[in-house]
Regions:
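Hydrophobic transmembrane alpha-helices and their immediate loop junctions
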Residues: 6-8, 15-254
């Protein structure tokens, strides 16, 4: 863009279409690259995230059935069909927004979500207070088991072909599986109802404390949102992610 003067002394701006086209084309290409990058990231995380959430919820239902309550089994929730467990907000919207936000400058790497809770009738368990601990613990333990499985997958990729295009994509998928499962396990172990950690704490507390504690469940999601927005949630999840980092480094070396 140049600035010229006319004979009457007035100045005007002279636009050069080539300059404008160049700037506009660059901006358009940059936007397309951002969209492609986001789409690729979603594809990489899709399978590990669906597996993480599906197996987590199925584990709750299976544990409940083994301990006396077949409610989830009868309702078809003890299944590897992800459609049965998907929650539109917790499984799709929230993780999607966090993923997009994490790609922005200064965005957080925190990624979590939730599925439709598996129905459990604690009164039908053989020992309700004790068994609710095992039912709640089954979900996070399943995620930690998947962390181990993805570590094995990562090691196999490193041994076979880490530098090929397919190997590079497989490494990204493995890292996605590791991070999603560790974050999901850590998030669910937060001792706030209705999360699994809250249910575990409820089972461990004496009755005189467990009852008033269970009454706080109605405020649970509000408390979790406050922790998320304030950044305090990171203090609970960070130690888990540090352990994961150490495990990945160990797998890479040995």
């Amino acid at each position: 863009m140049k600035v010229s003067a006319c004979g009457c002394g007035k100045r005007y701006k002279q636009f050069h279409f080539g300059d404008y086209l160049g700037d506009g084309l660059f901006a358009t290409l940059a936007r397309i690259m951002q969209i492609l990058s986001l789409f690729t990231e979603i594809l990489i995380y899709a399978v590990p995230a669906v597996l993480a959430i599906t197996l987590h919820e199925a584990a709750h239902g299976y544990a409940a059935k083994r301990l006396g309550d077949n409610t989830a089994w009868v309702l078809g929730r003890v299944t590897l069909n992800p459609v049965k467990h998907i929650d539109p907000v917790g499984t799709l919207l929230v993780p999607g927004l966090l993923l997009v936000g994490g790609m922005m400058p200064g965005g957080s790497a925190l990624l979590f979500g939730w599925a439709k809770p598996v129905p459990v009738n604690f009164g039908r368990l053989y020992n309700p207070k004790r068994d609710m601990i095992w039912v709640a613990l089954a979900g996070p333990l399943m995620n930690l088991a998947q962390v181990v499985a993805w570590l094995i997958v990562l090691k196999l990729i490193i041994l076979i072909s880490p530098e090929s295009v397919l190997g590079s994509v497989a490494v990204d998928v493995a890292f996605a599986g590791l991070s999603v499962n560790m974050m999901l396990a850590a998030f669910n172990l937060i001792p706030i109802l209705p999360l699994d950690g809250g249910r575990i704490l409820e089972g461990l507390l004496p009755w005189k404390w467990a009852v008033p504690y269970s009454n706080l469940e109605r405020y649970g999601m509000m408390i979790i949102v406050v922790l998320l927005v304030s950044g305090l949630l990171n203090y609970f999840i960070s130690p888990f992610m540090h352990v994961l980092k150490v495990l990945v480094q160990w797998v890479a070396v040995f």
